[in-house]
């Protein structure tokens, strides 16, 4: 069984703030998921061709088209900090400016 401390550690690494209820819920859910993965490891896949997709098909693609967004100020209004038309975020890498 996954320990609650492990969920807290992963949440910290992902910069997530979890409530006590969420920690308990995620501990249970992740324990179930890991148990299922262990079941999958027991399957005999000898002779089974590796696949990338369940269905043998390619999804259609389209060219990228840049379009101006009509309400830039509305988007930037949600930014905790900004510089002109850009979101301002804390520096995470050391180095020259």
Swiss-Prot record:
Q: Which GO terms describe its biological process?
A: glutaminyl-tRNAGln biosynthesis via transamidation; regulation of translational fidelity; translation
Alphabetical keyword list = ATP-binding, Ligase, Nucleotide-binding, Protein biosynthesis
Q: Which reaction does it catalyse?
A: L-glutamyl-tRNA(Gln) + L-glutamine + ATP + H2O = L-glutaminyl-tRNA(Gln) + L-glutamate + ADP + phosphate + H(+); L-aspartyl-tRNA(Asn) + L-glutamine + ATP + H2O = L-asparaginyl-tRNA(Asn) + L-glutamate + ADP + phosphate + 2 H(+)
Q: What class of enzyme is it?
A: ligase
Against SUPFAM superfamilies, the record matches this protein to:
Glu-tRNAGln amidotransferase C subunit
Alphabetized InterPro entries for the sequence: Asp/Glu-ADT_sf_sub_c (IPR036113), GatC (IPR003837)
Using the chain's own numbering, where are the disulfide bonds? none
Q: Does the keyword DNA-binding apply?
A: no
Q: Which GO terms describe its molecular function?
A: asparaginyl-tRNA synthase (glutamine-hydrolyzing) activity; ATP binding; glutaminyl-tRNA synthase (glutamine-hydrolyzing) activity
EC numbers for this chain: 6.3.5.-
The family line of this record is: Belongs to the GatC family.
Q: How does it assemble?
A: Heterotrimer of A, B and C subunits.
Function of the protein: Allows the formation of correctly charged Asn-tRNA(Asn) or Gln-tRNA(Gln) through the transamidation of misacylated Asp-tRNA(Asn) or Glu-tRNA(Gln) in organisms which lack either or both of asparaginyl-tRNA or glutaminyl-tRNA synthetases. The reaction takes place in the presence of glutamine and ATP through an activated phospho-Asp-tRNA(Asn) or phospho-Glu-tRNA(Gln).
Record-given protein name: Aspartyl/glutamyl-tRNA(Asn/Gln) amidotransferase subunit C
Organism from which the protein derives: Synechococcus sp. (strain JA-2-3B'a(2-13))
């Amino acid at each position: 069984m996954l320990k609650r401390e492990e969920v807290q550690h992963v949440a910290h690494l992902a910069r997530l703030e979890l409530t006590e209820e969420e920690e308990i819920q995620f501990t249970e859910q992740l324990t179930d998921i890991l148990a299922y993965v262990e079941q999958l490891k027991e399957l005999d896949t000898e002779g089974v061709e590796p696949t990338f997709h369940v269905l043998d098909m390619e999804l259609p693609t389209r060219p990228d088209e840049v379009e101006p967004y009509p309400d830039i100020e509305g988007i930037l209004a949600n930014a905790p900090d900004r510089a002109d038309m850009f979101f301002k975020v804390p520096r995470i890498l050391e180095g020259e400016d």
